[in-house]
């Protein structure tokens, strides 16, 4: 069988790019062929946008490395630092394990049934939670922190 393309038909110039008819046919690449480089991905999916870290995030991460004397001395803080710390970021940082323990440390009441399997003691569970809430010194703080993120 004779080749039906001549050498001049096998290649064509399209938008300044060399295109081989046998491999590309001048059409868009089929999605199942996969993306082989980041530039191809960005050309194929421009809605992905650039991967750029925001300046605010950069400034927040550098503030974690502050020394204790910088934290204690309010006069040495710059105006931009004060403004940034007063802005609400929507994040809640728990600095103590006590704060996390008061939220996640609740113990569930369980009792063994006659056949030896465990089940919740539903009758005493609500009463026990009320007593724990009254004795929890961190409850008010936790509720106020969670309320500010909503």
UniProtKB/Swiss-Prot annotation:
Region called Disordered, residue ranges: 1-150
GO CC annotations, alphabetized: cytosol; nucleus
Chain intervals with Basic and acidic residues compositional bias: 12-23
Keywords per UniProt: Cytoplasm, Meiosis, Nucleus
UniProt feature, compositional bias: Polar residues: 1-11, 83-93
GO biological process: meiotic cell cycle
Cellular compartment(s): Cytoplasm; Nucleus
Keyword presence, Nucleus: yes
Function noted in UniProt: Has a role in meiosis.
Full protein name: Meiotically up-regulated gene 108 protein
Organism: Schizosaccharomyces pombe (strain 972 / ATCC 24843) (Fission yeast)
Classification of source organism: Eukaryota, Fungi, Dikarya, Ascomycota, Taphrinomycotina
